[in-house]
From Swiss-Prot:
Gene that encodes the chain: otk
GO molecular function: ATP binding; cell adhesion molecule binding; protein heterodimerization activity; protein homodimerization activity; protein kinase activity; signaling receptor activity; transmembrane receptor protein tyrosine kinase activity; Wnt-protein binding
UniProt modified residues of type Phosphoserine: 681
UniProt keyword terms in alphabetical order: Cell adhesion, Cell membrane, Disulfide bond, Glycoprotein, Immunoglobulin domain, Membrane, Neurogenesis, Phosphoprotein, Receptor, Repeat, Signal, Transmembrane, Transmembrane helix
GO annotations of cellular component type: axon; plasma membrane; receptor complex
Name of protein: Tyrosine-protein kinase-like otk
Location (main, coarse): membrane
Region feature (Disordered): 623-683, 721-775
Keyword field contains NADP: no
Source lineage: Eukaryota, Metazoa, Ecdysozoa, Arthropoda, Hexapoda
Disulfide bonds: 47-96, 138-188, 276-354, 399-448, 491-543
Biased composition, class Acidic residues, residue ranges: 766-775
Amino acid sequence: MDMDVMMISMCILASTLMAPGWASTSGFLRVPQSQSIVENEAADFGCEATDPASYLHYEWLHNGREISYDKRVYRIGSHLHIEAVQREEDVGDYVCIATSLASGAREASPPAKLSVIYLESASVQLLGSNRNELLLKCHVEGASGDEPLQIEWYRDSARLASWGNVHLEEHRLLVRQPSPSDDGLYRCTASNAAGRVMSKQGYVYQANIKCLPRLLKKNQKLPESWGKQTFLCRGKRGGSGGLDQALSPAPEDLRIVQGPAGQLLIKEGDSAALSCLYELPAELQNQRIQLRWRKDGKLLRHVELGGAIPIPGHAHDSGKDALLREDARLVLHKQNGTLSFASIIASDAGQYQCQLQLEGHAPLNSSPGLLEVIEQLKFVPQPTSKNLELDAAVAKVHCKAQGTPSPQVQWLREGSLNSSLPDQVEVDINGTLIFRNVRAEHRGNYTCQARSSQGQISATVSINVVVTPKFSVPPVGPIETTEQGTVVMHCQAIGDPKPTIQWDKDLKYLSENNTDRERFSFLENGTLEIRNVQVEDEGSYGCTIGNSAGLKREDVQLVVRSTGDGFAPEETGGDGFLVTRAVLITMTVALAYIVLVVGLMLWCRYRRQARKARLNELSIKEAGGDQPDASVTNGKGSEQEPCLSKQRNGASGKPKSKSNGDAQKSDDTACSQQSRSSKKSVYEQLVLPRSGLSELLQIGRGEFGDVFVGKLKASLVAASAQSDKDADTEKQHSNSENGSGGSGSGSGSTTLSTLNEKRRSKTSMDDIEEIKEEEPEQSALEQLVLVKALNKVKDEQACQEFRRQLDLLRGISHKGVVRLFGLCREKDPHYMVLEYTDWGDLKQFLLATAGKVNTATATSSPPALTTSQVLAVAYQIARGMDAIYRSRCTHRDLATRNCVISSEFVVKVSYPALCKDKYSREYHKHRNTLLPVRWLAPECIQEDEYTTKSDIFAYGVLVWELFNQATKLPHEELTSEQVIQRSQAGTLEWTVAEATPDSLKEILLSCWLANPKERPSFSQLGSALSKAMQSVAEK
């Protein structure tokens, strides 16, 4: 049936192409299609028409207006490309217009609609609440194109479904006859192709019904004063009223003498302290007492006061929001209960309350205090200069300012009387400068002023009125000439500023320097003249005109006939010959197209049958083996992995080329791919069961997903070690059989299905709840691990970075580099499981020893590291990085935050890369990528070139962090943009830390030399550190 439909459509196409006359035979081989694109992603509209008699010129219209091309929106041949789609500018209808250069006939394609998919925020709205029903709505700021938004509801941490008295309908949640079992915090999540967001604030529901008494657990001890007939009243998570009523009040001699009462007004950037003076009786010294600080009802910081074992968790807080992440600005002093802020930011504003919690008793609360922050007056973002198109209907320049109180924004024009704005220029209530019917007199400098009680700030922008370049005399072709003749190609343009004209041949620029000056002449008006034409001059010539308003291009074909052919334009056959030639060409193209389509259909059918046969054979083999492959067990074959490599390693021993056209620059810039003779791919050999993980705790978010700390069964750790040993043995055996110069046959490639990418991969609460906790007696049989989830399965850049980190760590076996235990890929999201230590990352350890992190249980901060200890840490990291270099790999993000340290003072190079929250201050978005610009060498920022020498540069910054105890950032007096500018200009100066030994200063300074070849190697650094440790030990 499909073959018949295809044959009929091809016949119709052939008959259309062979009809005489372009007006009647005009048609589009390819028309632009409507599409929905995620904001900031690229969009492409295809357009291709046919005209047998002449060449065609293409134009594009957006909402009825001709498109002005620039660096973001430009034309590739006849197709339209939009680099980063913006919903405010690019939404609408797009039409392709094809014009015949011979007859001047024009034809327009059907309009194609572009819809932008975006997702900003979600919130829970209460529509109705009474005894009979509870009705909530999930309000979402976003759009999903033709696909509906996916809404999910959660009560506390449990996902809800339509069952029992709970009904879900589109964006609404209805609970009929609510009871105490329905109490809790209700939140919603919305997801589409642009991502997934959760409502920042939910709705807390608590039924006005007393909780039912239940029998106590067996052998549970209670005070004798409570009496024999005692029942336990269990409340729902998220509601504290019922639980507090079931607990006895706190002892009277346990008091909070002074709390954070009143209102505290602090300027942004200043320090602040909230007091909580308490009295702790002697008889309660050994009791479990916890001092807590809450902000807006949410737990912020806590510390143990009594001498008993610290309380690992409390059921009363299990339903609350998660604790704030580690923040060096906040310090809770155990001695007096004071909560101090090193530097106030705007988000610190809120209501604060301190609390004493004695186990078995209701919490003792202080009076609440209000902290208000005076936000500094600033522009968000800074206004920028702009080019406006002449006669544009509307043009806008934004100016937004923030501060306390809210500032007033005003625009002024320099050089005019009273600094007034010209006609048809106005300012709206948001501070946006609006130009209507842009004219030449609107050109000039404009100043945006923001005023408040804090003072005044201003920013000046330059407004330039430009005219898009247009062809006054476009090149016309094709041009046919004889050898040794003369050809003149006209190309003249108008615009403001005056456009420049550039000629190219076959996409290679032409100039007086790369052409024969005796034959090629570039006239002042843009005309190109070629004298004594040669056969090699034949080709496609393009004329590009451009100014600050945009670029335009026209192509012309030059055909050179040899004098031996007896060609003369006036002696060619009449119109009959041209028509016959056009018909023959059309029939040949149509026939070739039909043959190609039929061949592709047969080839695809053969590939499907071959793939099905391979999968069946693999399933049979794996079913009889000791360890079935995860892809076969999953029932979906190896096509389940859209983000991992689609090819298996061959046995040739040759490295594979990198994807996305990113050429391999040197041995230092990419990991060499080691060959394996195993039938399984390298990723299948890393498979770990997801059930082997337990007690996952999220510690942050990285570039491609969430990052957790958890535990892995010791049996799986041993199996992973044995697998690595077997792989090395197999590799040695393969090398002994094939020899160094031998080459084996490569394994077949496996096509991977992308059905999983129809939904957005995200780490959900259900995935974490599937990993059940182990019994306490099994904790000794578990290994602490770091788990990195791949959530962005549709982001090719994130998938490529995930594969790069896998290839980096799987090929290294060294005590100075963390182990890669395996890969959980039974379902999305994939988990990368790495070795972790009991003391965590090195930066937090350095901050703790410097007294910058609240240790909670300790009476005082740990002592600072000695010089010999710092040198030992630097030496271990240098050994680990030397192992990475010998594996022909690069790290690309070496810093103390990406190293881990154990209680045995063993330091290893790792890769947590928590760039989205915990260490977001140490990364900066440059060229649409988050980069640690303060640790990067100049060649990494300018040319995106990563080598071992760039890792040497980062290692020098790491040693600087070690001797400064990681208490400050490199060049913290500069902004990230200033660091980038000075690094590119070569004016960024580096100095070693004051505590650095004299013997190391010279080699550490050489790590930051501008020429990468002059920087030392890791082996040289290790030798220098070893000598420095010996000299320090002798002293």
